[in-house]
């Protein structure tokens, strides 16, 4: 897959009536920390809480050594392309704000060449 490949995904905030979701298109080679920024912008949030993307049992975020435990893998060092290829997943989880636990389901709808 080339750098010109685009991923269409739907992100849905779980357990919130009415359904709140966004459909987004991003480059396949986007870093996961930048994908987090896209999610923040799409939902008009302020990026003021911890977050994690989980692909099965593998979590990515911004590690914080002050917590004193093994945290998520560094999202600044992983791309969506790498993680999707490694995990062979079409869905993943996005958790924003560990206190309020805003959980999201993300579904990859389509992967296409950029037009």
Task: Name each region found by the language model.
Residues 1-115:
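Short linear regulatory motifs enriched in tryptophan with gly/pro/ser
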């Amino acid at each position: 897959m080339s750098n010109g490949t685009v991923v269409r995904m739907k992100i849905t905030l779980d357990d919130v009536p009415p359904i709140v979701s966004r459909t987004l298109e991003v480059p396949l080679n986007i870093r996961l920390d930048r994908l987090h920024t896209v999610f923040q912008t799409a939902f008009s949030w302020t990026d003021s809480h911890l977050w994690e993307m989980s692909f099965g049992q593998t979590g990515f975020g911004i590690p914080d050594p002050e917590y004193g435990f093994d945290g998520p893998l560094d999202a600044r060092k992983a791309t969506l392309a790498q993680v999707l290829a490694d995990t062979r997943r079409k869905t993943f989880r996005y958790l924003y704000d560990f206190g309020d636990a805003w959980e999201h389901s993300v579904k990859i709808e389509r992967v296409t060449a950029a037009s």
